[in-house]
């Protein structure tokens, strides 16, 4: 013990790297600093115990800001995790609505060890027509009184019920999304074989049920609500969530992009089970749905809010009303690059012209003086600012050539988090920025969208197969001030981790990737004005393409037959 103490006391205290240089062997561009570290070149770049590092997480040589933002976002998501004891089951949930649970899965899929139980419970209670129930609530929560008897299953011993708010049309495609996330994280083909037909039946319900499908337009319909929310434009609509012959109906773009994504996911999962003909049929259905949506819902710049069916519009602004699902439409790959850019440009325009503190609207313009008999403006989903629009918009901007705008959104949102003690809220007042519905709303949903924007948008790491065996790699770090960093993501459940080192110098840029990937599809953003002389993969020159998205230039190439570490150098 005395010898160990003497040895440690003789070590230098700061700024002397104590690390192996194996990572730099054979490289043209060398990493300059070991990470993790607490102090680099006199700067505090890491916390004492590296509390900022998680999955996903980042360490930089500049500061702790982005790392702490991710940590606080993870904390906000974890705060929404609790358990439900129902029907002899112990079910971990991130909010006890399957909708919120799946939207939040964008984040917790990385660390949660039980991705399956709530999905299994929901799928097992699928109704004969293919539809799903959506929320587990206590008996003294009166949502059960808002719906018909056949939309409820009671569990009296647990003082709980399982219900479906009939006016919503998003539940089925969200369950498919959740199932896809589970399968990606596990590659559990046995589970997929058991459940794929049930998932298909759910989307068949969405596209055939008289409650959900409008055959005239060939599109999914819902009760006339604000975007994807659960109260309709009619008197008593706040407390009556049924669909009756008096319920006003409409077509909302977000339901259709959701079903489109579900169809593409069903095609992908069928291919994983070698069912190619069925996969092609789902892809054809998806393309027809997208064509119909563009024909009837696209206003030339973005998707209009609602297309009323057999009822008058709520006001004269539906064709110009920008609603939150436009950002989801982009991230579900429902739009072309040109359409995606047009939607993002509309948000950028409204940022410059709005009197609100940010452009992350639920809807804009809001309904005046209120929506039906609910929520006078601006209140709740009728016109407030929301965290999940911020996250989805940032992610969308990264993907369509507005990378600097995506980074700007993240920076502005982090400023809000700092002011709010690291907290993320569901809704914010348009003018004062004060949190709204702080205790009741799904704040974790917004935090998860922001994590996804950083993970898949900024860091550009996408699992395009299962367990990161095939890696989409589209990093966009040059739009940030960070010149050297380490980014980690993956699935703790399967112990599949992607660990990326990055450095940008005058000579070029380098990415060193430790991952399970056997192949990589690279689409790497270049710094503005950079001219590429060559690209090295594992120290060997490879062919590449230069592509453009908007004014942004990327290096594109594919690499296969990979094992372990992949080293990419782009020389200027």
Region annotations inferred by a language model:
Residues 20-64, 68-72, 76, 93-97, ...:
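Catalytic cores of carbohydrate-active enzymes
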């Amino acid at each position: 013990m005395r010898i160990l103490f003497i040895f440690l006391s003789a070590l230098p205290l700061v700024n002397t790297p104590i690390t192996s240089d194996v990572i730099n062997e054979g490289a043209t561009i060398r990493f300059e600093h070991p990470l993790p570290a607490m102090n680099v070149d006199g700067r505090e770049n890491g916390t004492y115990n590296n509390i900022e590092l998680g999955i996903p997480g980042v360490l930089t040589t500049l500061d702790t800001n982005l790392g702490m933002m991710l940590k606080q976002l993870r904390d906000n998501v974890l705060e929404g995790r609790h358990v439900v004891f129902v029907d002899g089951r112990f079910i971990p949930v991130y909010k006890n609505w399957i909708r919120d649970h799946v939207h939040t899965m964008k984040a917790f899929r990385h660390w949660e060890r039980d991705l399956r139980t709530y999905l299994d419970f929901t799928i097992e209670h699928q109704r004969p027509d293919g539809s799903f129930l959506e929320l587990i609530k206590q008996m003294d929560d009166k949502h059960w009184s808002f719906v018909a008897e056949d939309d409820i299953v009671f569990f009296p011993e647990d003082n709980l019920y399982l219900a479906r708010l009939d006016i919503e049309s998003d539940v089925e495609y969200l369950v498919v999304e959740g199932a896809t996330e589970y399968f990606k994280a596990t590659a559990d083909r046995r589970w997929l074989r058991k459940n794929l037909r049930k998932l298909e039946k759910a989307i068949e319900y969405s596209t055939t049920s008289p409650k959900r499908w409008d055959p005239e337009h060939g599109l999914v319909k819902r009760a006339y609500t604000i975007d994807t929310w659960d109260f309709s434009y009619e008197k008593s609509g706040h407390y009556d969530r049924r669909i009756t012959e008096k319920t006003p109906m409409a077509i909302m773009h977000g339901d259709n992009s959701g079903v489109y994504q579900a169809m593409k996911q069903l095609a992908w999962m069928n291919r994983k089970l070698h069912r190619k003909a069925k996969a092609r049929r789902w892809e054809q259905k998806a393309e027809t749905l997208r064509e119909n949506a563009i024909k009837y819902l696209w206003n030339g710049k973005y998707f209009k809010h609602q297309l009323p069916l057999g009822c008058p519009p709520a006001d004269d602004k539906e064709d110009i009303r920008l609603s939150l699902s436009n950002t989801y439409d982009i991230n579900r790959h429902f739009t072309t690059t040109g359409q995606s850019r047009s939607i993002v440009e509309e948000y950028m325009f409204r940022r410059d012209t709005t009197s609100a503190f940010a452009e992350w609207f639920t809807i804009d313009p809001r309904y005046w003086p209120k929506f039906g008999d609910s929520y006078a403006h601006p209140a709740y989903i009728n016109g407030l600012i929301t965290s999940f629009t911020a996250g989805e918009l940032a992610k969308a901007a990264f993907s369509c050539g507005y990378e600097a705008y995506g980074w700007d959104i993240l920076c502005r949102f982090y400023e809000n988090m700092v002011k709010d003690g690291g907290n993320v809220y569901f809704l914010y007042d348009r003018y004062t920025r004060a949190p709204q519905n702080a205790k009741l709303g799904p704040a974790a949903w917004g935090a998860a969208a922001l994590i996804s924007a950083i993970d898949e948008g900024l860091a550009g790491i996408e699992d395009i197969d299962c367990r990161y065996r095939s890696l989409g790699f589209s990093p966009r770090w040059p739009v940030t001030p960070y010149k050297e960093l380490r980014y980690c993501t993956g699935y703790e459940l399967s112990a599949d981790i992607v660990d990326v080192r990055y450095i940008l110098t005058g000579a070029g840029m380098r990415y060193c990737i430790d991952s399970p990937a056997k192949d990589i599809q690279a689409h790497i953003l270049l710094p503005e004005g950079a001219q590429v002389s060559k690209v090295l993969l594992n120290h060997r020159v490879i062919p590449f393409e230069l592509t453009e998205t908007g004014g942004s230039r990327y290096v594109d190439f594919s690499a296969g037959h990979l094992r372990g570490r992949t080293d990419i150098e782009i020389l200027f």
